[in-house]
Structures are given as structure tokens and as C-alpha cells.
């Protein structure tokens, strides 16, 4: 936690504490997208940095935490986190969950830990081969860092797109 806060301070990563209301205008949606994309870029850089450290397993543990953080923070930015969705009327909650199911998102309006394992298992299989490049000094670490950044960024951008589709379908 201490190291995480140091990295967050160095990269000036915004800590998402408040839970926003559902966006109602396209301008509001655009602002939230910018905020979410900035967060995803910075968290992806952290993932990339952890990949450079030649300690087996460190990058995997950091990636798990960052995946969870990205998904939870993006949900909060869009007003689609678990607690907020559950506080809405049953009709709105049902519409959000239906729209999320149509988008194929297991993360919107739910606790992240349940669905995260399914995604992580699929993601780890893809990364495992790429991470083996660490055994080739310097070049392997650079390749590993690039792959880590790409996958973390893709996960975040895909989740942002799904959140926006859910909002637009309400």
C-alpha cells in the first residue's frame, strides 16, 4: 500500500473516492471518458514498470491489483459501481444490469472480485508466454513491459467503452 501511494504520487494518479451520478449529457460523458482514459494510461504505466523488475511473480501481483483498481475506478467515474447501482431503483438497476449483460461486461454494477478471476485466467494464459522473455536481459524486459502496458491499457479501454455503451442504452 505504501509503495502504491508513492507510485500514485509520482505519476499524479487521481484517487477515485467519490462515486459519480450517472452522466446525463454527451458533454458529461466526454469529460468522464477523458478522466477514465487518463487514469487507465497512468495505471498501465505502473503495470509496465512492474514488468521491468526481474522478480518472478511481482508483475503478476501488481497486475491483479491494477486490473481491479482500473475496473473499480472506471465504474465509479461513470456511476456504475456496485454500491451505487444497488442504491438505484429496481427498474434502473435492472436496466443497467441488462445493458451490461448485452455488452458482455461482468464488471459493471457488481463486485469486481467475482468476475475478475475469470478474466485474469484468460489474460494470464496470453501473458505467460510473453513474460518468459524476461529471461533475455534488457530486450526481454522491454518486450515484457510493452506487452504489459498494452494488455492493461486494452483492458481499461474496453471497460470504458462498455460503460459508455451501458450509459447510452439507459
Label every model-predicted segment:
Residues 1-50, 64-170:
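Terminal, membrane-proximal amphipathic helices
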Amino acid at each position: 500500500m505504501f509503495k502504491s501511494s508513492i507510485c500514485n504520487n509520482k505519476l499524479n494518479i487521481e484517487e477515485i473516492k467519490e462515486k459519480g451520478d450517472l452522466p446525463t449529457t454527451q458533454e458529461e460523458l466526454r469529460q468522464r471518458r477523458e478522466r477514465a482514459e487518463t487514469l487507465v494510461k497512468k495505471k498501465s504505466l505502473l503495470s509496465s514498470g512492474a514488468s521491468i523488475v526481474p522478480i518472478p511473480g511481482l508483475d503478476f501481483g501488481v497486475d491483479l491489483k491494477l486490473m481491479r483498481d482500473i475496473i473499480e475506478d472506471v465504474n465509479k467515474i461513470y456511476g456504475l459501481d456496485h454500491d451505487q447501482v444497488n442504491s438505484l431503483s429496481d427498474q434502473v438497476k435492472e436496466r443497467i444490469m441488462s445493458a451490461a449483460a448485452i455488452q458482455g461486461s461482468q464488471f459493471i454494477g457488481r463486485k469486481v472480485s467475482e468476475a475478475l478471476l475469470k478474466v485474469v485466467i484468460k489474460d494470464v494464459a496470453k501473458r505467460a508466454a510473453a513474460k518468459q522473455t524476461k529471461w533475455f536481459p534488457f530486450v526481454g524486459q522491454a518486450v515484457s513491459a510493452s506487452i504489459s502496458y498494452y494488455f492493461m491499457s486494452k483492458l481499461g479501454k474496453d471497460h470504458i467503452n462498455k460503460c459508455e455503451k451501458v450509459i447510452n442504452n439507459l
